[in-house]
Amino acid sequence: MSKILVLNDKFENSGELELPASYAEVNPHNLYLYVKSYLAGMRANTAHTKSRAYVSGGGKKPWRQKGRGGARAGSTRTNVWVGGAVAFGPTNEKNYFQKVNKKQKRLALECALAQKAEAGKLFAVDSLAVESGKTKDAAKIIEALNLRDALIVKDLLDDKTLLAFRNMANCYVVDASEVNAYLVSVFSSVIVEKAVLQTITKEG
């Protein structure tokens, strides 16, 4: 059974919670499909080459068809000519979007959470608010748990908490409404508020 480590106000272990049994039964392929789709959606699509339709010039036949003893040519902009077009090259018109069903997104998140819980890297606390808005106070949370990096999932993310974690290269803070399977997977540890956990683990 996948267990979530519950922490007190001093970020010390104070108990455990169990994820729904169905989480451990999710096919990991759902997580693979979601991450693949997410990364495809992040592609900038800047690679671009010009085909013969877009290369300037080359409209005039460079020499007559017969009689010179050389190979025939109809344009100076074919892909075999220097300064010519590119054959079958990438264009910025390509759409890399990969559809993932809503149910698959949900299953992917469940699988990612189950994997983190199984590894003992999913933590739940009452509150992650950093009222001072200072990075040094936010860093104490990570130092107390001795974590390399962490995804911080906050219920109703406020500006001060965002400012506190924003300067930390090994942390990323996100509102509960924006958490997804990719973010859960890419960080070695996940810290969530209990209220968030009750929402995202609600079955059905």
Swiss-Prot record:
Gene3D superfamilies per the UniProt record, alphabetical: 3.40.1370.10
GO molecular function per UniProt: rRNA binding; structural constituent of ribosome
Annotated GO biological process: translation
Positions of region (Disordered): 53-74
Keywords, ordered alphabetically: Ribonucleoprotein, Ribosomal protein, RNA-binding, rRNA-binding
InterPro entries with a match to the protein in the record: Ribosomal_uL4, Ribosomal_uL4-like, Ribosomal_uL4_dom_sf
Keyword Ribonucleoprotein: yes
Pfam families named in the record: Ribosomal_L4 (PF00573)
Gene Ontology cellular component list: ribonucleoprotein complex; ribosome
Keyword Ribonucleoprotein set for record: yes
PANTHER family referenced in this protein's UniProt entry, alphabetically: 50S RIBOSOMAL PROTEIN L4, LARGE RIBOSOMAL SUBUNIT PROTEIN UL4M
Family: Belongs to the universal ribosomal protein uL4 family.
Quaternary structure, from the entry: Part of the 50S ribosomal subunit.
Described purpose of this protein according to its UniProt entry: One of the primary rRNA binding proteins, this protein initially binds near the 5'-end of the 23S rRNA. It is important during the early stages of 50S assembly. It makes multiple contacts with different domains of the 23S rRNA in the assembled 50S subunit and ribosome. Forms part of the polypeptide exit tunnel.
Record's protein name: Large ribosomal subunit protein uL4
Gene: rplD
